[in-house]
Amino acid sequence: MSVKKKSKILTLFKRMLVFMLSVVLIWICFHHIMKLVERDQYPAIGKYIQVENGRMHVYTKGNGPNTIVLLSGLGTASPVLDFEPLMNEMSTHNKVVVVEPFGYGWSDMTDEKRTVEHIVGELRSALQQLNIPGPYVLMPHSVSGMYSMYYAREYPEEVKAVVGIDATWPAALDYFNETPPSMPGYMRYVAPAGLARLAISLDARNYLPLASEGTYSDKNLAMTKAITAWNAYNENVVQETNELGDNVKKTAHISFPSDMPVLFFSREDDRVREDGKSLFTFLQTQLTDHPASTIIPLQGHHYLHWTQSKEMNEAVLKFMNDIEDRE
């Protein structure tokens, strides 16, 4: 190959490299401009509570004899938006509260480690500053089950009951001999680099609730897409994921107080392992001695509230009535 031809190829390669870098930089700039526009277009729908050195976004709806605190699963873009159908159902008879943890929804980021102690402490501080008296009905989804159990064990006088939404309880990993998930540190750059926005632009279905049309409003879905573009896999979510192993070790030995009523919503799952263990047999080990404690299997996604909000609301009303009848 002649020197002249090599020079042309090298020049072409350099131009292509410059072009690709330019496209990347333009996209990153576009993402951050859109982020500013969207933050102005979609302001927080609740109110901010100052906790430690940051602001936590809190949303409340309804009134009633019970205060139900909805707690989100790991990495949920905006718990307030995600729980909207369930809030709408439950707020007809109860006060419903959603506290978005640091790194979620409209809440700030935090430098505090994502230990179970810090996460529960921040939640508790936010609830206290709302001046909403307990005891609360904690209603955790997924990994928040672990935080709820810790809260109930440390502060039993502040918890009236716990209702799990396909929740993760600390003893599950040991029971099924599984390991906690982890997330590579570089994932924290997905949102700042505009990659989350790109993924949503290409196929938003993977980032939106799998619910029937009309369950979530168009505005809700638009805000969910925007917040996902801002926050997906952010540093706090990555830290929380990688802290799960230690958090499970801290909580694996604890259980709910024996007299605390608990209700477990779980996905219908008929699978039984060779050792005879199943989701149902595990949940039976987590039930308390309270006569109202029970397990209710439901058809649906891990995010059961996407499709079963009405059924869940009716079951919780019955559950709370059973508790009151036995007091």
Each language-model region and where it sits:
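Alpha/beta-hydrolase fold catalytic core
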Residues: 2-68, 92-94, 321-327
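Conserved HGGG/HGGXW glycine-rich cap/lid loop of the alpha/beta-hydrolase fold
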Residues: 57-106
